[in-house]
Swiss-Prot record:
Residue ranges with Polar residues bias: 29-40
Motif range (Q motif): 55-83
Pfam family name, one: Helicase_C
Protein name: ATP-dependent RNA helicase SUB2
């Protein structure tokens, strides 16, 4: 990774707590800040809640309004990452968290920030930055879902491709100004630069998919400019499904004495209940094989990944002509259209979605239980984000990758090595639906 531009990153302490989580045990490394403050004779609440673990959401002692919303969502027991993170994050501890897709990382920062929020008219208290517009839209919806019994809390989403004047109008009116801002870096930087938004009261600063946001130099510089517009005394939380050793030091420069949690370090791909297969075939055989799979397999919703916008459009036309009603989403369509199609798919208006990698990160649609790599991607890391659309939140799911050339074979080999997983060839006789469908 290039180190260009790192010299102006904010320098904070490199001391951190690190928790390595797997299915059997939790190991805590390093000195907690509790111990450090005892030595220094100081009292600092950040990092002082190590070892608090809860088995039910009620044990977190959240606001009654949040507890009611959680019950309405049907949640009772926190996931592994929620269990280890929420008890400290609700008390203001900085967090660096890597956990595989589908373990509820979004709920960690949504619940934690809502728990701490004391809304003041006209003041932005929470900033959430993510790399994709669809993801920003989805995070906003999670805030709406969990704040349903907090009528005074307002949330807004800002991203490029829409008139900035509308954003400015919303922000300058105290009756409409949000307390929680979810945004992509470019648009939020523009609002800060033009003094359309005041971030001097921010108490919580969150970056979702932090590796993607910070590994691109331009996006990282946008984040730095936004970060400098916020108070130094605030909570910073960062989350991602993949967090390489190279990007972690970059993340840490934004953090103070963070709690670090890595669930399945190096993102070893053990997505709960997800069956993974590949199919070797010629390029010209892909359409016929895809139609056969859609006929033979049982699924609630399926997402099919392709490598380009033109292929997404052509494949969608072919599927619709073949009596497989499908919707397509890609980065070259207008933002309003992308959001509308995402919502239509999420609302189950269509069961088949053909997409480029615009849907490959963070997008959460619970009914998806089949992911097909029509075109295998070029890099191993993105595999986790693609197939992670299926089998989320511990449910079963199925991922199938088409392998049509030597380059695909090399990528498949890298995926298996990178994630320490064995991907089997799809059996000619098919597979038992009970292996990838919930009862």
């Amino acid at each position: 990774m290039s180190h260009e531009g790192e010299e102006d990153l904010l320098e904070y302490s490199d001391n951190e707590q690190e928790i390595q989580v797997d299915n059997k045990e939790t190991a805590v490394e390093g000195t907690t800040e509790n111990e450090a403050t005892q030595e220094n004779g100081e009292a600092d609440k950040k990092g002082s809640y190590v070892g608090i673990h809860s088995t039910g959401f009620k044990d977190f002692l959240l606001k009654p309004e949040l507890s009611r919303a959680i019950i309405d969502c049907g949640f009772e027991h926190p996931s592994e990452v929620q269990q280890h993170t929420i008890p400290q994050s609700i008390h203001g501890t900085d967090v660096l968290c890597q956990a595989k897709s589908g373990l509820g990382k979004t709920a960690v920062f949504v619940l934690s920030t809502l728990q701490q929020l004391d809304p003041v008219p006209g003041e932005v208290s929470v900033v959430v930055i993510c790399n994709a517009r669809e993801l920003a839209y989805q995070i906003r919806n999670e805030y709406l879902r969990f704040s349903k019994y907090m009528p005074d809390v307002r949330t807004a989403v800002f991203y490029g491709g829409t008139p900035i004047a509308k954003d400015a109008e919303l922000l300058k009116n105290k009756d409409t100004a949000p307390h929680i801002v979810v945004a992509t870096p470019g648009r939020l930087k523009a609002l800060v630069r033009d003094k359309m938004i005041d971030l001097s009261h921010v108490k919580n600063f969150v970056i979702d998919e932090c590796d993607k946001v910070l590994e691109e130099l331009d996006m990282r510089r946008d984040v730095q400019e936004i970060f400098r517009a916020t108070p130094r005394d605030k909570q910073v939380m960062m989350f991602s499904a993949t967090l390489s050793q190279e990007i972690r030091p970059i993340c840490r420069r934004f953090l103070q004495n963070p709690l670090e949690i890595f669930v399945d370090d190096e993102a070893k791909l053990t997505l709960h209940g997800l069956q993974q297969y590949y199919i070797k075939l010629e390029e010209r055989e892909k359409n016929r094989k895809l139609a056969q799979l859609l006929d033979d397999l049982e699924f609630n919703q399926v997402i099919i990944f392709v490598k380009s916008t033109s292929r997404a459009n052509e494949l969608t036309k072919l599927l619709n002509a073949s009596n497989f009603p499908a919707i397509t989403v890609h980065g070259h369509m207008k933002q309003e259209e992308r959001i509308a199609r995402y919502k239509a798919f999420k609302d189950f208006e269509k069961r088949i979605c053909v997409s480029t990698d615009v849907f490959g990160r963070g997008i959460d649609i619970e009914r998806i239980n089949l992911a097909i790599n029509y075109d295998l991607l070029n890099e191993a890391d993105q595999y986790l984000h693609r197939v992670g659309r299926a089998g989320r939140f511990g449910t079963k799911g199925l991922a199938i990758s088409f392998v049509s050339n030597k380059e695909d074979e090399e990528v498949l080999s890298k995926i298996q090595e990178r994630f320490d997983v064995k991907i089997a060839e799809f059996p000619e006789e098919g597979i038992d639906p009970s292996t990838y469908l919930n009862n």
